Amino acid sequence: MAFLMKKKKFKFQTTFTLEELTAVPFVNGVLFCKVRLLDGGDFVSLSSREEVQENCVRWRKRFTFVCKMSANPATGLLDPCVFRVSVRKELKGGKAYSKLGFADLNLAEFAGSGSTVRCCLLEGYDTKNTRQDNSILKVTIGMFLLSGDPCFKTPPSTAKSISIPGQDSSLQLTCKGGGTSSGGSSTNSLTGSRPPKARPTILSSGLPEEPDQNLSSPEEVFHSGHSRNSSYASQQSKISGYSTEHSRSSSLSDLTHRRNTSTSSSASGGLGMTVEGPEGSEREHRPPEKPPRPPRPLHLSDRSFRRKKDSVESHPTWVDDTRIDADAIVEKIVQSQDFTDGSNTEDSNLRLFVSRDGSATLSGIQLATRVSSGVYEPVVIESH
């Protein structure tokens, strides 16, 4: 039984990419990283030395190595395998360095997961005297199984998800397609589509109550009794015991015309009734019907705007009582003016004449003979 307690051995081909370090608290400087395996191997390497630009350092350095891991034979859970990334800063022209911080990554969490991107905060070496900076290290880890049992378990991930403000997890789609469940209702609320039409409910009297929806035009209301779906009417007539088309046509007969209800009743499959006699007996045998509702507006905002406008027009306010009516003032001014033609014939046909010596005169028809003799010359003044 000793072989059952022996731990399982695994080998993984690991690809570690050192991407970048953001939020660096330095304006300038040269940074580099030292990476090494604390467990499962003796891999040690250094990255390139890069300058700080806009509080960010980008290495894009890729490391490839083999990592050994073990797992519990009873549970198959992989043991921790720590990989440390140490960030350092050059001093004295590269002759010395100072340790800024480090990040420990458990490679067992990434076993067999392909390529995974992870961002982690740097931890300070001396937590008492050195302030921990808020620099964020971004790495990419890819691990592929080389040898060992492919049936193993990875430890729970230590990564913490960051919730973005303004987004609710309940707004996610829970189902696909047009269903009538809660997922369908959430889909309708996201896409902005109309909810499904509600079916009419059955009253205690046995007649179906129509939902709060009407046709858009009076012509459709007039022809609705003629073009109603017989299958839908037959379903309602089987439940209530009364023809839906007959009830609709009888309610419209008072407003439009008298209709033969025996044809519609036989088409709907319900109780057929023939109406004969005067209108008085017809109203006695008919159940009380609600008058047809007015056409429903397209948008609720139009209804509220119309209701608000009607209420303002029907109820005069104090401002309307004290305000001067501009139309009345304009009408009063127009009535006080005299628009009759008071022009005299003597003032008409006036002309300006200028003689050769520079003298000018105004005259009417009397000076026309003198113009022809050449004493005066007419002057034409264009209107602008």
Curated annotation (Swiss-Prot):
Its main location: nucleus. Induction: By 17-beta-estradiol but also by a group of natural and synthetic estrogens as well as by estrogenic environmental compounds. Repressed by the antiestrogen 4-hydroxy-tamoxifen. It is found in: Nucleus; Cytoplasm; Membrane raft. InterPro entries: EEIG1/2-like (IPR039931), NT-C2 (IPR019448). Coiled coil: none annotated. Residues 129-138 are annotated as: Required for interaction with TNFRSF11A/RANK. One of its GO terms (biological process) is positive regulation of osteoclast differentiation. The keyword Iron does not apply. PROSITE patterns: C2_NT (PS51840). Keywords: Cytoplasm, Membrane, Nucleus. The keyword Cytoplasm applies. Residues 173-315 are annotated as: Disordered. Belongs to the EEIG family. Part of a complex composed of EEIG1, TNFRSF11A/RANK, PLCG2, GAB2, TEC and BTK; complex formation increases in the presence of TNFSF11/RANKL. Interacts with PRDM1/BLIMP1; following TNFSF11/RANKL stimulation in bone marrow-derived macrophages, the interaction promotes the binding of PRDM1/BLIMP1 to the gene promoter of IRF8. This is Early estrogen-induced gene 1 protein. It comes from Homo sapiens (Human).
